[in-house]
Amino acid sequence: MTDGAEACPGASKVKSKKAKVKSELSMKENDLKDRLFQFAIGVLKMLGNLKVAKETDVIKYQLSKSATSSGANYEESQAAVSKADFINKVGISLKEMRESNYWLRIIKELFPKTENIVYLVGESEELGKILASILIKSRN
C-alpha cells in the first residue's frame, strides 16, 4: 500500500505549503502573545513609577487589572474548546485592551511626562486593532 504522497506527486508540495502557512500563523500568534505579555509588563512597570496619590490609586488598580487581563484572556483563547469559546475570550481580551487604553489616556493627560506613556497608549491602540481584526475574521 502506498501513502498519498506517492500516489499524487504534488501532494508533498501541498503539505509543505500548508505546513509553512500553519507555521507562519503560529509565529504570528506567538508574536501577539509576546506583545500582550510585554504590554502588561510595561504597564506594570510604568505604574510602579507613577506618583503615589489618592486620585491615582483607583486608576492604577483598574489599569493593572485590565492590562494583564487582556493577555490572560488571549492566552485562554488559545485553548478554547469551541469557536464560540474562542470568540468569547478574544472579545473579552479586546474589551480589556480598550479599557486599558482609556486609563492610559487619562494618565497621559494628567501626567504627560510619565515615562513610556505615549508608547503604551499607541501600543494599546495597535493591540486593540489586531484583536478586533481577529474577532471580525473569527465571526465570519
Q: Where does each model-flagged region fall?
A:
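Short, C-terminally biased terminal segments at protein or domain edges
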Residues: 1-76, 80-140
